[in-house]
């Protein structure tokens, strides 16, 4: 039987080994800006820019560069606001994201989104390792892809064992290099010769950019709970993630309009150096997914040691990355949006309707099965809206309105007002 009990007390400046230990509050505004800024820049973001530019698929007419950039700004701004709002809740309560859902659904009910989030995070972690491995194969073509995948998976797992320590490294060193590399590519990548394309598919492009941002909502509180203040958590998430994702997509859109994204980067002078900086930075995305998968599992098993869980998750994502390819990435993004956009609407609306009353985040939190109804309605709305409408916005509004309606019914409030 797997022994997941802690062997020694957690260090006071690092994430506790279990959910039963005190939560250190060591991250300031610069730490949060560094973390979320780095999460906003991704090799997958460059791939996502292709999906924004071609919302109808590679064989459909593309958006114009202006339309694609505007879709990126709108989707990113909405998604960053959702991240910031969830981060504020995490900083205020000291609870990770899936534990917050105990207040929304009760302990048993929170298992449903927790399992879905574990699946999502395993998917993201796998895609990140695949992306890094594929990128390194282009830079050093003589090394087999599987070698890079195993190496990246190993480093990812090691970083996930000391997440707060790695956040401090991001803030002090990596963020500066990333900004310089991104700025250089933005100036060096040649602009496309023409502005072909239109506005057809604009709402789908918004949903694609929004889905990438919203995919981070289920992990926002995992780091925000370590913030010294609510302001640092919310502002760091909104500004750091929003500005850097838009910048990342802008570079990707220009490159995608000119040809293969990675090939365009490598063709410019010093492009290999800038590209390698971004490849190395990608490790923060992969380790963040491994860590948040671990914390999500701890919502179901609070006493399990996160070090053991992170090791297991790292091995699983690395194993999957040996066989997974990027063909279904765009579909994966839209599926994520259909689940987590309405969940965010339910979460934030429920908090507002409670008028500041505390959620019951304890291991005995009572079930609130009615709150699953607005979430289900939001998911249905996402898949039923016509193609010209924004599925993300409609599903969020439907879920939020249904949550507000549920609050006029009896027994929708948590039976206790305590925070973990």
Where are these regions (language model features)?
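Extracellular loop-to-transmembrane helix junctions
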Residues: 51-88, 102, 109-111, 241-242
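Transmembrane alpha-helical segments of multi-pass small-molecule transport proteins
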Residues: 38, 114-118, 139-162, 176-183, ...
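Membrane-interface "cap" regions at the ends of multi-pass membrane proteins
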Residues: 1-65, 201-206, 218, 225-235, ...
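Hydrophobic transmembrane alpha-helices that form the core helical bundles
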Residues: 109-141, 282-299
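Membrane-interface loop-to-helix entry segments
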Residues: 147-188, 197, 234-241, 333-345, ...
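C-terminal membrane-solvent junction of multi-pass transporters and transport-like membrane proteins
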Residues: 23, 197, 344-405, 409-420
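Membrane-water interface regions at transmembrane-helix termini and the short interhelical loops
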Residues: 88, 131-139, 153-174, 192-195, ...
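Hydrophobic, membrane-embedded alpha-helices of multi-pass small-molecule transporters
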Residues: 27-46, 186-257, 266-287, 367-379
């Amino acid at each position: 039987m797997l022994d997941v009990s802690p062997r020694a007390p957690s260090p006071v400046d690092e994430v506790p080994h279990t959910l039963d230990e005190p939560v250190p509050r060591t991250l300031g505004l610069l730490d949060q800006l560094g973390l979320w800024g780095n999460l906003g820049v991704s090799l997958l973001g460059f791939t996502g820019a292709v999906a924004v530019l071609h919302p109808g698929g590679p064989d459909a007419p593309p958006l114009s560069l202006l339309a694609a950039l505007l879709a990126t700004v709108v989707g990113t701004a909405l998604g960053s606001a959702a991240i910031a709002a969830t981060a504020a809740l995490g900083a205020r309560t000291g609870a990770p994201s899936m534990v917050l859902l105990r207040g929304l659904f009760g302990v048993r009910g929170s298992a449903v989104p927790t399992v879905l989030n574990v699946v999502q995070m395993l998917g993201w972690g796998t895609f990140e390792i695949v992306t890094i491995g594929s990128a390194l194969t282009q830079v050093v073509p003589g090394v087999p892809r599987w070698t890079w995948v195993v190496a990246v998976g190993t480093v990812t797992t090691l970083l996930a064992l000391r997440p707060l320590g790695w956040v401090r490294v991001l803030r002090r060193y990596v963020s500066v290099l990333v900004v310089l590399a991104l700025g250089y590519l933005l100036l060096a990548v040649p602009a496309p010769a023409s502005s072909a394309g239109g506005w057809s598919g604009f709402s789908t492009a918004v949903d694609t950019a929004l889905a990438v941002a919203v995919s981070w909502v289920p992990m926002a509180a995992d780091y925000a709970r370590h913030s010294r203040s609510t302001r640092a958590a919310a502002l760091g998430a909104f500004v750091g993630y929003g500005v850097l994702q838009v910048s990342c997509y802008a570079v990707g859109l220009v490159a995608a309009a000119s040809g293969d994204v990675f090939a365009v980067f490598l063709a410019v002078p010093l492009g290999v150096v800038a590209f390698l900086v971004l490849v190395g930075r990608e490790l923060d995305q992969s380790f963040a997914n491994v860590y948040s998968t671990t914390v999500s599992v701890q919502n179901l098993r609070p006493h399990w040691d996160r070090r053991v869980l992170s090791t297991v998750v790292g091995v699983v994502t690395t194993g999957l990355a040996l066989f997974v390819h990027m063909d279904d990435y765009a579909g994966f993004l839209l599926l994520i949006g259909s689940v987590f956009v309405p969940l965010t609407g339910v979460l934030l609306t429920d908090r507002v309707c409670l008028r500041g009353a505390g959620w019951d985040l304890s291991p005995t939190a009572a079930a609130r099965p009615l709150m699953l109804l607005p979430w289900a309605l939001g998911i249905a709305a996402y898949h039923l809206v016509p193609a010209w409408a924004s599925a993300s916005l409609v599903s969020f509004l439907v879920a939020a309105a249904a949550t507000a309606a549920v609050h006029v019914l009896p027994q929708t409030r948590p039976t206790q007002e305590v925070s973990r």
